[in-house]
UniProtKB/Swiss-Prot annotation:
It comes from the Bacteria. Residues 19-38 have a biased composition (Basic and acidic residues). Residues 1-38 are annotated as: Disordered. Pfam families: FliE. It comes from Helicobacter pylori (strain ATCC 700392 / 26695). GO terms for cellular component: bacterial-type flagellum basal body. Keywords: Bacterial flagellum. The gene is fliE. It is found in: Bacterial flagellum basal body. This is Flagellar hook-basal body complex protein FliE. One of its GO terms (molecular function) is structural molecule activity. GO terms for biological process: bacterial-type flagellum assembly; bacterial-type flagellum-dependent cell motility. Belongs to the FliE family. Its main location: other. The lineage of its organism: Bacteria, Pseudomonadati, Campylobacterota, Epsilonproteobacteria, Campylobacterales.
Length: 109
């Protein structure tokens, strides 16, 4: 038994798990998290801008329908349906984000 405890060659595969390597991984992980946080923010802003554009197209289609300037009624209906679906999706994303935030607040440390 003592030979096993004193033989450091048996521990060589585990020597890579020392604190220096762990610190490097943690540092790179924090950088990764910061980058991903920025990416999420960009994605969210992009999605909101796309939703806004879709809503504007829908409003224009409705105005054109009301004034009789629209030539293709089907395209207007598609634009309105697309805007409605996009809004529902964004509301669900918002609801899930709020739910996740509330769950984090309830988490005890």
């Amino acid at each position: 038994m003592q030979a096993i405890h004193n033989d450091k060659s048996l521990l060589s595969p585990f020597s890579e798990l020392n604190t220096d390597n762990r610190t490097k991984r943690e540092e790179s992980g924090s950088t990764f998290k910061e980058q991903k946080g920025g990416e999420f923010s960009k994605l969210l802003k992009q999605s909101i801008n796309e939703l806004n554009n879709t809503q504007e197209q829908s409003d224009k289609a409705l105005a054109d329908m009301a004034t009789g300037q629209i030539k293709d009624l089907h395209q207007a209906a598609i634009a309105i349906g697309k805007a409605e679906t996009s809004m529902k999706l964004m509301l669900e994303v918002r609801n899930k984000a709020i739910s996740a935030y509330k769950e984090l607040l309830r988490t005890q440390i």
